[in-house]
Structures are given as structure tokens and as C-alpha cells.
Design a protein with these regions (language model features):
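Histidine-/acidic-rich catalytic cores in large beta-rich domains
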Residues: 1-271
């Protein structure tokens, strides 16, 4: 989207699963996790790399590390975190992640993100917590959450956690300097909060997903795809684009393209 217009879009021809994560790289390529696989495509929609999950497994979150590596979490029994070289297709690093319900892949993970320190924040949906791991899989920090969906590390070292209750900014000590609940903006109903992002202004953008199988914008009047609020929770901007020419559909994830290159991150020694 640029200036309120859709300038590029992609419909997965396979269409096998829900898209839960998508990242645009600085070269215009897009890496996305689509439940039963991970794919990177060019701006002209050619597949650069693709991975299909084995039966009984799912992938809902993936991120680039440099131009040649991808980190993703594969739900299943066992659930694993992998770093793959997409040039050689070799798995260069793998860690087993503990889950509460190993035989229920769908509800294990939806989102993870790398920190500036080269660690990984993981939202454990089925274990009701957010955990920070180092490169070797050692747990460095954790915080309880109610079926956490999104986790966003902040430059100040704090973490934005999005769960069933709302959004909380959590410090390393476990303090909560800021929080948001759907009741804070009653004019804009939320059905399922997904993720949150802190803007340079200090405002926070929160996105909302409509379950297209059982609910629609028509029977959820006022539903938004995203909302921007100030630290005082005043509404700055609302995204409600359900109809042509900019029919965006349910919003699982957002990316602000003016920020740093998505691939300029590291996981331990891997850049």
C-alpha cells in the first residue's frame, strides 16, 4: 500500500493454508509463511525458495537473516526452530522447542521475532508464555501471557506482547509501563488482536483479524484491520478497507516499509 492504494499484491496459487507472517526484504522480495510451508518470491512473483512442511506440521512464522538465510519455527511433534541456507538448502541450525500439546500442531506457535541482541522472542500459544532464547536454545527470559499471538522486541529492550487480553509493553523486570485493551477504543471493535508495533513517534499500531470462516465485516460492524493509538490511547488512524478498490481482507500482519531492512538482523553468530 502506498498513499492509500494497492501497488502490489500476490495471491498464493497453491492456497493451501493461512498466511500468518510476511516480510518484504530490501530488494523487494517477500518471504511469507503460509501454514504448510514457507516461500520467498521476487517482485515479479517468481519463486526464489520454497519449503513444504511434512504431514502433521505447520509453519506460521518466518524471518530473513541476511539475504541467504531464513529462520522459521515448524509446529509439530517435535516443534523445531530452524535456520536454513536458502542457497544451498542446508539446515544450518536446529533447536527443539518445548510445547504443552505436542500432538496439536496448529495451536503451538504463531509468531517470533529476533531482538537487537541476536536472541529470539517466541510466543508460545499453547504454553501461555513468551520466551526469549539464545542461539543454543537456552531460556533467557519469560513472561506469562494468555494465548500470546504476537511479540515485538522494542529498541529500549522492552517487549510488546499481544494476547487475548490486549497488548502489553513489558520490561525485563516484568513491569508493564503501557497496555491496551479493546475496551480502550469502544468505537472500534476488535475480534482477534494479532500483533502490535511501536512507531518512532511513540504511537502504537495494533492489527485485528476477522475470522473469514465464521465472521465477516458485515456481521461485525465497525471492525478494523488496524488502529494507531497514542501513548494516552487516543485514536490517530484507523484502517478499514473491506471494499474495492482496496479490499485488503483480514489483517494478520503488517510491515512499515520505511523502517530498517528486515534482513539486517542476526541470531547469535548467524548474520
Amino acid at each position: 500500500m502506498r498513499q492509500g492504494k494497492v501497488v502490489w499484491s500476490y495471491d498464493d496459487p497453491a492456497g493451501k493454508g493461512e498466511v500468518s507472517d510476511a516480510v518484504m526484504l530490501s530488494n523487494g522480495n517477500v518471504l511469507f509463511a503460509h501454514q504448510f510451508g514457507v516461500t520467498e518470491i521476487t517482485p515479479d512473483k517468481k519463486v526464489v525458495w520454497n519449503y513444504d512442511t511434512p504431514t502433521g506440521h505447520e509453519v506460521h512464522t518466518a524471518m530473513p537473516i541476511g539475504r541467504d538465510r531464513v529462520l522459521y519455527i515448524q509446529n509439530g511433534d517435535p516443534a523445531v526452530l530452524r535456520v536454513v541456507n536458502i542457497v544451498t538448502n542446508a539446515t544450518e541450525h536446529e533447536i527443539t522447542l518445548q510445547t504443552k500439546y505436542p500432538d496439536s500442531a496448529h495451536g503451538q506457535f504463531r509468531h517470533a521475532r529476533l531482538t537487537d541482541r541476536g536472541t529470539l522472542m517466541v510466543a508460545h500459544m499453547d504454553s501461555n508464555k513468551v520466551v526469549e532464547y539464545d542461539y543454543d536454545g537456552k531460556e533467557l527470559w519469560s513472561f506469562p501471557a494468555d494465548v500470546p499471538w504476537g511479540v515485538t522486541p522494542l529498541p529500549n529492550g522492552n517487549v510488546l506482547i499481544t494476547d487475548r487480553e490486549g497488548v502489553r509493553e513489558v520490561t525485563r523486570r516484568g513491569d508493564i509501563p503501557w497496555s491496551f485493551r479493546p475496551s480502550d477504543t469502544p468505537a472500534y471493535p476488535f475480534t482477534s488482536l494479532q500483533q502490535a508495533w511501536r512507531l518512532p513517534s511513540g504511537n502504537t499500531v495494533i492489527n485485528n483479524w476477522i475470522n473469514e470462516w465464521t465472521k465477516t465485516p458485515e456481521n461485525e460492524p465497525g471492525s478494523v484491520q488496524a488502529i494507531e493509538v497514542t501513548p494516552a490511547k487516543q485514536v490517530v488512524w484507523v484502517l478499514q478497507a473491506w471494499n474495492p478498490p482496496a479490499s485488503l481482507g483480514p489483517a494478520t500482519t503488517l510491515q512499515f516499509l520505511a523502517g530498517p531492512a528486515a534482513e539486517d538482523v542476526h541470531f547469535g553468530p548467524v548474520y
